[in-house]
Amino acid sequence: MTSETRTLYSQLPAIDRLLHDSAFLSLRDRYGHTQVVDLLRRMLDDARDVIRNTQTLPDWYADWAQEAKLRLENAAQSALRPVINLTGTVLHTNLGRALQAQEAVEAVTQAMRAPVTLEYDLDGAGRGHRDRALATLLCRITGAEDACIVNNNAAAVLLMLAATASGKEVVVSRGELVEIGGAFRIPDVMRQAGCTLHEVGTTNRTHAKDYRQAVNENTGLLMKVHTSNYSIEGFTKTVEEAELAEIGRELDIPVVADLGSGSLVDLSQYGLPKEPMPQQLIAAGVSLVSFSGDKLLGGPQAGIIVGKKAMIAQLQSHPLKRALRADKMTLAALEATLRLYLHPEALAEKLPTLRLLTRSEASIREQAQRLQARLAARYGDEFALEVKPCLSQIGSGSLPVDRLPSAAMTFTPHDGRGSRLEALAARWRMLPVPVIGRIYDGRLWLDMRCLEDESRFMEMMLK
């Protein structure tokens, strides 16, 4: 050890002396003595590492209290931090998918703060069923005989298969053997459910005769899977749900469908691309239909199954149902969201997902231009700020080839160095409320479609 290093080490303060500093007294009151002492020990270790490696004191040496405060605040932040989603993907899986309506937020808060009638029948003063209230709503909206709720749509598919076709064959078109995020594959789910996959048709063409020829004494289900996260175009042929349901009736084989994203309203009335609706499949005679709660429906993560009463009863009595059941917060949020669908005239205003999807390009562009003028003074020395047209996507595997015209604020470094974009994006990710955009074509793009809280955005961007 050199004499210079030894001198620097000697300048490091003792923990006891720091603890008696007035600034540290307030930190001890807020975070507790033990946590502050543990932090100071780590800070001293960090300081020794800096001295050993650089022969200098750390840059925060002059204000230990401020550095400790920053570290304690960072450690106290929730792992689930609010962010500003300007990626251009409305239902961003990594950012939590659908934002909840105010009614859903209030319902969840109430369910957390007080005992609720989760499985209690007020009329009979005995045990009730946790799905009952939602089943009534879902039947009213979809026209189904009954309904079942689990914790996500993957669970819904697993439960449908395990409860109705374990040990039997399930007939599916080869072009519908989907894989979604996290390597969730229909063939794997079938195997886990104890079913045998029977593929029919080809990747791009499947005919009604393929299903008929596949049926044998061990056939348990005919299954239709909506390819919500990819599209096959060109020389194609599929069997529609109504036709498949007719085949099922002829051969006395139940037909089930996995809709994936599942919209409860006709999106085309809002100028959006059409998606198949559960009520259409129920009307066509499909026995069971599953779909997600947190995609186009705009509610919490949940798996929803609607259909024939007798088959729903099979699901409810299966051991997996208890393992996969939804909790009271999910049920509270989902019920509040479904009630919004009873007043369709106000849905686009009250349901955040639909509100964001239906924003006009003109209103988004006006917002971007207005905010660009205010941000130019802050970033103009290093970056050229422009408002450019762009295309948003719905996300979460919904309508994969369809895009929504939007507008973005773009940041292009004057010196053309891509590293400046990476540094800027990293800086925004470290903000108290991170701002998340995307880097593309030599620019950092902030798609403004999902920006509703302008004041919070500007507060972060001007830090």
Swiss-Prot record:
Designated name of the protein: L-seryl-tRNA(Sec) selenium transferase
Keywords: Cytoplasm, Protein biosynthesis, Pyridoxal phosphate, Selenium, Transferase
Free-text function comment from the UniProt entry: Converts seryl-tRNA(Sec) to selenocysteinyl-tRNA(Sec) required for selenoprotein biosynthesis.
A GO CC annotation given for this chain: cytoplasm
Complex and partners: Homodecamer; pentamer of dimers. Binds only one seryl-tRNA(Sec) per dimer.
Species of provenance: Salmonella enteritidis PT4 (strain P125109)
GO function term, MF aspect, one: L-seryl-tRNA(Sec) selenium transferase activity
EC number, UniProt record: 2.9.1.1
Chief location of this protein within or outside the cell: cytoplasm
Cellular location(s): Cytoplasm
UniProt family annotation: Belongs to the SelA family.
Cofactor(s) the record lists: pyridoxal 5'-phosphate
InterPro entries noted in UniProt: PyrdxlP-dep_Trfase, PyrdxlP-dep_Trfase_major, SelA-like, SelA_trans, SelA_trans_N_dom
Catalytic activity: L-seryl-tRNA(Sec) + selenophosphate + H(+) = L-selenocysteinyl-tRNA(Sec) + phosphate
Pathways involved: Aminoacyl-tRNA biosynthesis; selenocysteinyl-tRNA(Sec) biosynthesis; selenocysteinyl-tRNA(Sec) from L-seryl-tRNA(Sec) (bacterial route): step 1/1
Positions bearing N6-(pyridoxal phosphate)lysine: K295
Entry-linked Pfam families: Se-cys_synth_N, SelA
GO biological process: conversion of seryl-tRNAsec to selenocys-tRNAsec; selenocysteine incorporation
